[in-house]
Amino acid sequence: MASGGAFCLIANDGKADKIILAQDLLNSRISNIKNVNKSYGKPDPEPTLSQIEETHMVHFNAHFKPYVPIGFEYNKVRPHTGTPTLGNKLTFGIPQYGDFFHDMVGHHILGACHSSWQDAPIQGSSQMGAHGQLQTFPRNGYDWDNQTPLEGAVYTLVDPFGRPIVPGTKNAYRNLVYYCEYPGERLYENVRFDVNGNSLDEYSSDVTTLVRKFCIPGDKMTGYKHLVGQEVSVEGTSGPLLCNVQDMHKPHQSKPILTDENDTQRTCTHTNPKFLSQHFPENSHNIQTAGKQDITPITDATYLDIRRNVHYSCNGPQTPKYYQPPLALWIKLRFWFNENVNLAIPSVSIPFGERFITIKLASQKDLVNEFPGLFIRQSRFIPGRPSRRNIRFKPWFIPGVISEISLTNNELYINNLFVTPEIHNLFVKRVRFSLIRVHKTQVTHTNNNHHDEKLMSALKWPIEYMFIGLKPTWNISDQNPHQHRDWHKFGHVVNAIMQPTHHAEVSFQDRDTALPDACSSISDISPITYPITLPIIKNISVTAHGINLIDKFPSKFCSSYIPFHYGGNSIKTPDDPGAMMITFALKPREEYQPSGHINVSRAREFYISWDTDYVGSITTADLVVSASAINFLLLQNGSAVLRYST
């Protein structure tokens, strides 16, 4: 059996090391502690690690304290009042169960849905379609407007997957249906917490959206999407692809002569061929010898690499389908006691109180939308050039009737904590006074050109930080065909559409001209589209009593830099460029201890102003401000009240 050899720990005792390690102080303390222990007659005069840690950190020593026995259990409760249908209010009573209540999550199942059957149109007819757009099925020989002659144009009907549909057929097609983005966030329009008729806190779906944009860490986003009904892309790969590898320092070429910044010529060395052949061995072996012998250095400049392409696709609730299956949602509540177990409410301190969670549900039209289930196919043969053909598609989008979505399994899961009777009695007998953080929200409409300023009259109490966004009214308008995608975005959203043709060729007789209109082409039925969110605030300012706290800062400073610098792992930089953050605390959301605030209850002249090139009399918007406000919760006489109400 081998034994370890002797070793020495060599410490550099330079000036910096003396400050960082304080080795002289450590040696002196050890000696002093030994002398003191000897003077007291202790059999073991050596110091303890806890004594050493009074002045020095010991990284290899772990600590623990005994803890008060505690257990927890999730308890399901059904609605106390309210009809469980979309658009209604549900009220859940918090039962007297356990000693504390902490986490809460709502569970709902949205029933399956589909659109109604519709008749295929007759060629030459027109009908008013979705979002006020006239739909026309042109006659052959005419352009899309059904009035301008277009020689060689032939029209047929197809479904979204290119399958033909006979014009005039009864019950020939159905529109597809899909859910809005993050339906779990939109489902809860408003959530309120009441004790004995007093509202202690409430928040809207805008607050939930901003919390997700700024506070849900990236490593938990996939799980969060599963909970709130947002589809997650799946990864696919292609087969093996052969690639040529290029190296500018090719071994078979002479050494190139380059000129540096001082106009001095210098000779460059080429890459070692043996080095390259080790990394790209595909042309260094044949099929028979691959993997059986050492790689042979080569002098050929062509190195090969075999790779795969990665593709992403989605098939979740936001993907249009003829039949949307039932959708289960798990929606976490966002009150102060839900976020931090240290602030769990002692249920035993409110033995006779009425504790309720009231939830206002969104309507069905805000959650589901239709996708056109019928398209008009234009196939045009160019007269005199029979080899040229262009194929284009346009949707025939007539709204159907979406089946009513049922709402089942309406439950509120409450995390109840249990402690020993001795600890239980302490909370029953004593008055509890704790610092809490509640939501204060203000939504203000604006239609002023270029510049506007709003008084934050709905904000009060000490404010630690604010999430701010200017949301175009168009984003939630029924006339917006993409409002189910845009509803949560704080900016103007435009569509970027890929080039419509995915096949193009030049006929043999047109090869000499090679003009764009000489090509045959086939467009996609539904071209690839991706949204681009454009921030609509250029500069933002915050003033209190006429004093500029933030003076025309660019919006990117508040949307990117502030959340990047502050908050540690508790705050992230949002993907939405229009979502902004302003903080008055040094460590927002990082720790329970406050680290800065502005008391807007005293500074009532509290304004937010901004510059914009988007907002006007037609392109209106709503300013959304969600603030974290400090208050104090007083538990006494069987009830819970806020210390400050104004």
UniProtKB/Swiss-Prot annotation:
Biological processes, Gene Ontology terms: symbiont entry into host cell; virion attachment to host cell
Topological type in the membrane: Peripheral membrane protein
Q: What is the lineage of its organism?
A: Viruses, Varidnaviria, Bamfordvirae, Nucleocytoviricota, Pokkesviricetes
Q: Tell me one Pfam family matched here.
A: Capsid_NCLDV
Protein name, per record: Major capsid protein
Main localisation: virion
Query: Which family does this protein fall into?
Result: Belongs to the NCLDV major capsid protein family.
Q: Name one GO molecular function term.
A: structural molecule activity
Subcellular localization, per the record? Answer: Virion; Host endoplasmic reticulum membrane; Host cytoplasm, Host cytosol
| Biological role stated in the UniProt entry | Capsid protein that self-assembles to form the pseudo-hexameric capsomers of the icosahedral capsid. The capsid is constructed of 2760 pseudo-hexameric capsomers and 12 pentameric capsomers, with a T=277 symmetry, about 200 nm in diameter. The capsid encapsulates the DNA-containing nucleoid, the core shell and the inner membrane. Plays an essential role in virion assembly. Involved in virus attachment to the host cell.
Q: Which domain of life is it from?
A: Viruses
Assembly information from the UniProt record = Homotrimer. The membrane-bound form, but not the cytosolic one, assembles into large complexes. Interacts with the minor capsid proteins M1249L and p17; these interactions form a rigid zipper structure that stabilizes the capsomers.
Q: What would be one Gene Ontology cellular-component term for the protein?
A: viral capsid
Which keywords describe this protein according to UniProt? Capsid protein, Host cytoplasm, Host endoplasmic reticulum, Host membrane, Host-virus interaction, Late protein, Membrane, Viral attachment to host cell, Virion, Virus entry into host cell
Q: What upregulates this protein? A: Expressed in the late phase of the viral replicative cycle.
Organism, scientific name: African swine fever virus (isolate Pig/Kenya/KEN-50/1950)
